[in-house]
Amino acid sequence: MSKEFIRKLKESKPVVAICYDFDKTLSPDDMQAQGYIQSVGDEVESFWKESNGLAEENDMDQNLAYMFTMIRKAHGKVLFTKKALMDYGAKVQLFPGVETWFKRIREYGVDKGVIVEHYIISSGLKEMIEGTKVANEFEKIYASSFYYDKDGVAQWPAQVINYTSKTQFLFRIEKGTLDVNDSGVNDYFKPEDIRIPFRNMVYIGDSDTDIPCMKLINSYSGHSIGVYNPKTKDKRKVYKMMEDKRIKYYTPADYTEGSELDILVKTIIDTTASNEKLMSIHYQDKQEQISRNGQPDNQEDKEKEKLIMDLENSNSFKQTHSIISKLKKIKSWTLEEKKQLKIIAEKNKQISSIMKDGDVASFYSSLE
């Protein structure tokens, strides 16, 4: 049975999408290290060493490796259910200001005439993120997740997100096709019909796994922000990302009101509000120009425009005769089109030299 996907439609106001990694972007540590690893009697360092070793030895995706390792280590020790993972998520610590950040930034957007939406794009576990205090603040949480049996016990990965696959979700956000199975993400949209252009996206992350998303957003004039732990003040990663042109800005991961990050994101919202007014004027002017010039809006008009261009670029008598035979099949020409055809005949020697040939002469006579 096919599913009918719910899609977000273009708004009457500009929309800014702020996309976040989770671990070490909104939270100071990996989510697995804040309760789960300890509950199975393991050390954080040894867990990741084992998981990464499994990936390396078996040519395995690192995220699939950690998901497999989590299931295996939980066996016989703790229940590995969706509820248990959400309970672990409830214990996850957040950086300063995160709990009030999302509502505050949305309200700032409202004051500026901009809709602000928050999204998670993370290689971490969706179930744990859904257990956090801020889970309901997001339009959509894109993260790795498990398939569960009838008893709610995790059996198999349902979704795995790595650093390269993260980028597909930016296109989903762009077009409003948020469901992971909605093939509408491949549909063509005119630039003016795009729900959230990349220029109106902000990506906030902390490490190499965020680079593909940052690079994509940068290439379309969006905004990429690197964050670092405000307690350790270790800026080595953000310096490297800045040097490699992966980010435009960096700040401490301090989400409190008046912080560097708070001021930066509000400035981006201000800029978006002004820029989208200009883009709106541009699209209005473009539409007026199309209407005034009669730019093709049906198949016959498109065919006429193509043939006129082909005739103008013709570089042989044989090609000219072939194009003329197609032009003769068209019964109606506008005054502007007739003018174009006559100018081409005067300027292109491949036409002017054979104006007395029967087919060419009869075609141009029909334009009088």
Model-derived regions: residue spans:
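Alpha-helical substrate-recognition element adjacent to the catalytic core
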Residues: 2-150, 241
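C-terminal cap/substrate-recognition subdomain and adjoining C-terminal extension
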Residues: 96-119, 123-339, 352-368
